[in-house]
């Protein structure tokens, strides 16, 4: 069997939440002509298309977005797993936003991607500088770690995983990026 490559997007192929650099996109584009690869990300399809140039996106065997809960081949969605968060979880998250010791609050704290939630105390709309400030603050406060622990305790059927620099990804247990391996294995065996 030929080699198959699986790449995470944020922090691997691109700087966190930013587009692929021009130099790297040229390198990766040339590399992708002779290799079989898949992309996996916690981001939704729109953000992924902002980060990855279309000519690389289209060469991927598939792109798994929202932690593998959506699969795309080119512009066509192949599947989607729905997730409806319970209201008491939403209330818990708002309580964490309102009672955080971090002074930065920007907006877009709870992003419902319909297949998962992405939660951020500082807010998804923060600037790169605010993102870095929060990330440094969280290293010592362990705020995200403690919130994730609270989610896992209060909702044992859900998983909460620290994502990137400012957020927590929340989804049904087992509906994480590892689920993509089964799809890839089935296609190549």
State what each model feature region is:
Residues 7, 42, 65, 112, ...:
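Conserved strand-loop elements at the edges of beta-sheets that form or border functional pockets
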Residues 2-19, 39, 181:
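Asp-based phosphoryl-transfer active-site loop
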Residues 18-109:
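Active-site phosphate-binding/coordination module
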Residues 12, 69, 124:
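Short glycine-rich anion-binding loops that position phosphate/pyrophosphate groups of nucleotides
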Residues 103-189:
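Conserved acidic, metal-coordinating active-site core of Asp-based
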Residues 1-2, 34, 60, 114:
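A general structural motif
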Residues 15, 73, 127:
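Glycine/Thr-rich phosphate-binding loops of Rossmann-like dinucleotide-binding domains
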